[in-house]
């Protein structure tokens, strides 16, 4: 037991030093600063309205609730790709989890990337001396990408047969082509308790508050500040407040069928007024999902998510649908979601994920 706690201390120690160092610096609040991760992990969860804190039990648990990694029994690998806004925004997720048989613990590594690629950089296509476009401007146009990335290192174990817990060390990187980038870090923690067929889960994302450090490469802007009269932006430090996720799930066997229901509530502390349920600066985001599985082979799913309001206080709820197939050690899942409210013109999201156990 003593060795176990020493391992946890060594795992957390570098990040605790970062937090102490950051406390001496000035940070501005970053509303929606970690929202690129809200896309999630795995198409199964999307089909269930992202209600997954209590029922997650595979490699994707590193995102939904790291305590769920304690259920991983063999090497578990997952990959997911999705596109939004007519393919403009791409999202990729990959993860691997490995159980440590001797200690009944699991370690995992996850990677997330959301980006817009092939953006035209037209700055050098402008002749600043003539104040006109250059001849053959296409020869001066370069392409760049804007991307948000995250790396999550996870550890989970069981405190008892009913109780499991897990922690994440998270590193994020935002890159705006060659012009600017930011690095950030935080810790997540989660617990899950099982009572028969009922599970209760709690997950605190960015438990330590995410600290992000921006830097701008002013050399990339040349003398455009003098030409256009625009002020070149400067880097600043940002902080992202914690998010508290709570969920409950219940499963019931009905002959060859297994029926699973889940309900989650996400509590954010960023004064998000677009959500229907608010209490001061705290917003409450409910998620509900239902899954029916036949002989542990074929699954159909449905859910509700994104309860929002518009300027006229009209309430909108986004429905989700999904399906999954399990063939030996291969899991293929599909999820579908529609943008709600005033964003319906932005289309729908189709998500496919693949998971393999070895």
Predicted segments with their positions:
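Bacterial N-terminal signal peptides that target proteins for export
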Residues: 1-10
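Bacterial Sec-dependent signal peptides at the C-terminal "C-region" and cleavage site
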Residues: 20-24
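Bacterial N-terminal signal peptides
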Residues: 9-19
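Subset of outer-membrane beta-barrel
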Residues: 25-358
């Amino acid at each position: 037991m003593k060795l176990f706690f020493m391992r946890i201390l060594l795992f957390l120690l570098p990040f605790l030093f970062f937090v102490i160092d950051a406390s001496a610096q000035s940070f501005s609040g970053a509303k929606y600063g970690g929202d690129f991760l809200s896309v999630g992990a795995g198409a199964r969860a999307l089909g269930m309205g992202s209600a997954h804190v209590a029922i997650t039990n595979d490699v994707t648990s590193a995102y939904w609730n790291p305590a769920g990694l304690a259920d991983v029994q063999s090497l578990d690998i997952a990959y997911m790709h999705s596109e939004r806004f007519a393919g403009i925004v791409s999202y990729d997720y990959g993860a691997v989890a490995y159980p440590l048989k001797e200690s009944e613990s699991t370690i995992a590594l996850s990677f997330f990337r959301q980006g817009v690629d092939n953006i035209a950089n037209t700055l050098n296509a402008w002749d600043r001396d003539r104040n006109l476009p250059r001849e053959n401007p296409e020869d001066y146009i370069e392409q760049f990408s804007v991307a948000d990335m995250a790396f999550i290192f996870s550890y989970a174990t069981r405190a008892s047969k009913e109780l499991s817990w897990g922690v994440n060390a998270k590193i994020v990187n935002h890159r705006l082509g060659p012009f600017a980038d930011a690095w950030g870090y935080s810790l997540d923690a989660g617990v899950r308790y099982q009572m028969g067929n009922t599970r209760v889960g709690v997950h605190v994302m960015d438990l330590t508050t995410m600290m992000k450090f921006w830097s701008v490469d002013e050399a990339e802007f040349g003398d455009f500040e003098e030409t256009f009269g625009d002020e070149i932006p400067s880097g600043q430090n940002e902080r992202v407040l914690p998010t508290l996720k709570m969920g409950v799930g219940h499963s019931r066997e009905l002959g060859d069928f297994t029926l699973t229901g889940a309900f989650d509530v996400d509590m954010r502390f960023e004064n998000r007024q677009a959500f229907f349920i608010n209490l001061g600066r705290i917003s409450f985001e409910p998620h509900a999902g239902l899954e029916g599985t036949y002989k542990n082979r074929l699954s159909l799913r449905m859910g509700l998510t994104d309860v929002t309001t518009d300027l006229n206080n009209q309430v909108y709820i986004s429905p989700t649908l999904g399906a999954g197939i399990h063939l030996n050690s291969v899991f293929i899942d599909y999820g579908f979601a529609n943008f709600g409210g005033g964003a319906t013109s932005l289309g729908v999201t189709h998500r496919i994920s693949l998971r393999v156990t070895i």
